[in-house]
Amino acid sequence: MALPEFTMRQLLEAGVHFGHQSHRWNPKMADYIFGARNNIHIIDLAQTVPLLHTALQAVSDTVAKGGRILFVGTKRQAQDNVADAAKRCAQYFVNSRWLGGTLTNWKTISASIKRLRHLDEVLSSGEANSYTKKERLTLQRERDKLDRSLGGIKDMGGLPDMIFVIDTNKEDIAIQEAQRLNIPVAAIVDTNCDPKGITYVVPGNDDAGRAISLYCDLIARAAIDGISRAQGELGIDVGASAAPLEEDLPAASASTFQGLPGPRGTADDLKKLTGVSGAIEKKLNDLGIFHFWQLAELNHDTAHQIGEEVGLPSRADAWVAQAKSLADA
């Protein structure tokens, strides 16, 4: 993998250069404005290109070091793109209303996430049958409300190492919280926004659907590049090892996988695997996985099933390759 490439033509075709009406501008964006046409400010893409590249590099570097990226975009035209991009690169997102204190009051947010997990367990198990229809409906509504706000971060396991924001005016509370905690912020900054306090300013249209889709795709690909770099630093060639793993190891289906009732001796530190937080490690332990050798023996289908169980299916194959290397170390 390599850092995603893009051209100025792609930015032009996506409408990245179109700012807001000139009378709605923020003077602090003057340095990034090329001029005005029909009372619409035109963003200087000659500056956007290198600044976007810098932001992509920062995202890749953060993920390569085991960091977590939080995508934030709650406006209607950004919601689907933000969620899809974050899921594609095994990162995290908020695409509904930002709850005040999501970052600065993580302890309370964690309690709400715990409640969401409990409701998921209750509603998906036989325990739900012990409630009346009205009680089940009430629980389902509570669960859906929590999932809208917290579903994208319930597996994050802690504060993010960087946030990527679409529309800094709408997401000003998220940015303020990140600044208070010294969390770097990469953001798309339109001509009506204030770039102050944004670590990685990317001047661009934050309203056009095609532009938002392009930003999210590039950030997701940069995060995937970071994952590949992290694997490379461990000496793992996933592409080369995936086929031999399936041929050499005994086949096991998701339905026949048997976890261990407990660790055999000292459990391995599964957090050494890319993207595995303390919360994900606990999920793996709950499935009876405590050692690298257990993951190393999985075939593709079983690994993917386990990845889905813990909410990170896209990283399952990489875990198998990493686990094989770590088990042999």
Curated annotation (Swiss-Prot):
Swiss-Prot/TrEMBL keywords: Ribonucleoprotein, Ribosomal protein
Single GO cellular component term: cytosolic small ribosomal subunit
GO BP, sorted A to Z: translation
Tagged with keyword Ribosomal protein: yes
GO molecular function annotation: structural constituent of ribosome
Gene3D superfamilies with a match to the protein in the record: Glucose-6-phosphate isomerase like protein, domain 1, Helix hairpin bin
Annotated family: Belongs to the universal ribosomal protein uS2 family.
HAMAP family: Ribosomal_uS2_B
Protein name: Small ribosomal subunit protein uS2
Organism this protein belongs to: Bradyrhizobium sp. (strain ORS 278)
